[in-house]
Amino acid sequence: MGPPPAARRREGEPDNQDPAGLLTDKYELTMLAAALRDGSANRPTTFEVFARRLPTGRRYGVVAGTGRLLEALPQFRFDADACELLAQFLDPATVRYLREFRFRGDIDGYAEGELYFPGSPVLSVRGSFAECVLLETLVLSIFNHDTAIASAAARMVSAAGGRPLIEMGSRRTHERAAVAAARAAYIAGFAASSNLAAQRRYGVPAHGTAAHAFTMLHAQHGGPTELAERAAFRAQVEALGPGTTLLVDTYDVTTGVANAVAAAGAELGAIRIDSGELGVLARQAREQLDRLGATRTRIVVSGDLDEFSIAALRGEPVDSYGVGTSLVTGSGAPTANMVYKLVEVDGVPVQKRSSYKESPGGRKEALRRSRATGTITEELVHPAGRPPVIVEPHRVLTLPLVRAGQPVADTSLAAARQLVASGLRSLPADGLKLAPGEPAIPTRTIPA
């Protein structure tokens, strides 16, 4: 291989201005070039997005990323700078095609916030081979990340039993992924995020007050740590009011709680404990706060929490949780492992037959059956336009998302949050268990 082409960006310049069309894999473009050359580029096709299986032991997943995809589609372009780069390995006809590229196809799929299971046809992308193949990496980048985060977040929401959770993982992931993670967590039921960009871009409520550094900043050389903590708390209360949250574990939690109430009075909004035996410390802090008259002061805990440690704290006097690393890494499942497979050409089903990686052919839609109580019982995948006759309660899952390249779906976060909440309520009792198990409901596919 020869040397790489010269980069246009100088070292030290920001790297977040890459043309959206370049957020892809090279082989999408080399396939396009070959298809344009042999005349197959304009053949009508359908690509399907699905997961062959859930992450090990998971019982359901939560679809997230739909809104971000619809937001990204109009920006998925190849500008002059991008085309200059691509001309180094693509023929002129392909570069001309990319210069004028606009996705003008249709997309159907599950609404954002919908639950999914193995084989669920989460997205169906229709258009010419040329325009559909170019979207593969963009679609999978968004859905594999956001769905992994939302699926982990939903498990944490269930484990918290109605207590609020705050997403605090920005410093544990890429700066752009942090914004998407905050959005996905909020969809799944988190109450807020520490990320201000997520607030500005998506309206996710932002929470945050102070770190240990602020307390240590007030230490005097050789002076007692207790005085430093008091000074820090007084400064924070004077700036933010008594309803603020004071971090009480920089030195000693018992002393920290006393200093917090002394600084803010009985109207202190909350204390946060970020280390140690959180359950034990929360009990001790609750008793101490009540003795000091701060009976309405809330207790927030944080520090390497995941769904399992959150569940273990359900019996403790904890009012809310701050979750970082485990959330933004998918709590052990950093990708949803979704794939983007060609399932139809010229209206005729096609399918991959490789061992362990089979993908049923044909464009598909889905519905979900349930009992009269609302508890879901089965996911039924059927050929598009040919739904089976079902007399028991059911709900259609496949909805129009894009028509002729234009978004047509409601992608509001409020609607997605409501869909997640109702979906979790509809699961069978075993479906919410954190212990490893089979998918909460079976998926049955009617062949084309």
From Swiss-Prot:
InterPro entries associated with the record: Aldolase_TIM, N/Namide_PRibTrfase, NAPRTase_N, Nic_PRibTrfase-Fam, Nic_PRibTrfase_pncB, Nicotinate_pribotase-like_C
Modified residues (Phosphohistidine): 212
Keyword set, alphabetical order: Ligase, Phosphoprotein, Pyridine nucleotide biosynthesis, Transferase
Pfam families: NAPRTase, NAPRTase_N
EC number: 6.3.4.21
Pathway the protein acts in: Cofactor biosynthesis; NAD(+) biosynthesis; nicotinate D-ribonucleotide from nicotinate: step 1/1
One Gene Ontology term of the molecular function aspect: nicotinate phosphoribosyltransferase activity
GO cellular component: cytosol
Region (Disordered): 1-21, 353-372
Keyword presence, Ligase: yes
Catalysed reactions listed for this entry: nicotinate + 5-phospho-alpha-D-ribose 1-diphosphate + ATP + H2O = nicotinate beta-D-ribonucleotide + ADP + phosphate + diphosphate
Gene3D superfamilies: Aldolase class I, nicotinate phosphoribosyltransferase
Example of a GO biological process term: NAD biosynthetic process via the salvage pathway
Modification comment: Transiently phosphorylated on a His residue during the reaction cycle. Phosphorylation strongly increases the affinity for substrates and increases the rate of nicotinate D-ribonucleotide production. Dephosphorylation regenerates the low-affinity form of the enzyme, leading to product release.
Family per record: Belongs to the NAPRTase family.
Function: Involved in the Preiss-Handler pathway, which is a recycling route that permits the salvage of free nicotinamide (NM) and nicotinic acid (Na) involved in the NAD biosynthesis. Catalyzes the synthesis of beta-nicotinate D-ribonucleotide from nicotinate and 5-phospho-D-ribose 1-phosphate at the expense of ATP. It is not able to use nicotinamide. PncB1 contributes to basal NAD level.
PANTHER family in UniProt: NICOTINATE PHOSPHORIBOSYLTRANSFERASE, NICOTINATE PHOSPHORIBOSYLTRANSFERASE PNCB1
Protein name, entry field: Nicotinate phosphoribosyltransferase pncB1
Encoding gene per record: pncB1
